[in-house]
Amino acid sequence: MFKLIIFLFLTTILFSNCKTAVEPIDSYSLGSIDTTKNAKTLKLVWSDEFNIEGSPDSTKWRFESGFVRNEEAQWYQKENAVCANGNLVITGKKERKNNPNFIIGSTDWKTNRSFIDYTSASLVMKKEHAFQYGKMEVRAKIITQTGLWPAIWTLGINGEWPSNGEVDVMEYYGNKILANFAIGSATRCKAIWDSSSKPMSSFDANWANSYHLWTLEWTENKMEILLDGVSMNSIDLTTSINKSDGKNPFRQAHYLLLNLALGGNNGGSLANTTFPSQYLVDYVKVYAQK
């Protein structure tokens, strides 16, 4: 099972509505990078090592707010993300609040619940820091409980989801680690997925007690996701063309999201989940070729 990589090309809906990406911007253009070369050929062009105390750097990140996607249980709020002891700490909490968007009789999952029962945080890289090609590293520690859905992922800056392209550098749910790519299908708001996963039984019993390094290596013709230096999934960018608009969503700049979702379509039941629960990020680094 450890060596088995399953490629699934299927059409599915990820969000309850299409997600519109940020407007076109001037971004880091990192150039095609030869990932077979020594790391000394790389230069650091953007990073956050979270070596401050308190709120994350507002020049680098913005926050999602409210109920956002996938019928997840958490209400996103910036208060659940802090920098402490050299880490970004995203905390999932069980706490009850009034839902300010509640509408009596609503059939929309975001507005038909009168209370918020769980909170968490989702950080989004500010648009001026979006990057294209090169290498991104995220060192993080996740808790592998049922109900938790931590993620490291990117979205393209142009177009609505999924035609803007999605890269799930890391997701955890269903007792497995996932690495996925998504492009647009011929049907609006539906994705074609290239997915890979490894069950937690593939890893050492103490795996979740340590930090791990997730890497996205990105050239003009290939993207590859690695976990602790081992390939999890890759995609040929000469063929990753949207069925919807004929564009290649991985030949444009992408921006990063770091979030801890709770429950929802993939996270599972929260009945036995321990709260508060923390997702720790040691650093994010983006490199270009020298």
Where are these regions (language model features)?
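Bacterial Sec-dependent N-terminal signal peptides
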Residues: 1-27
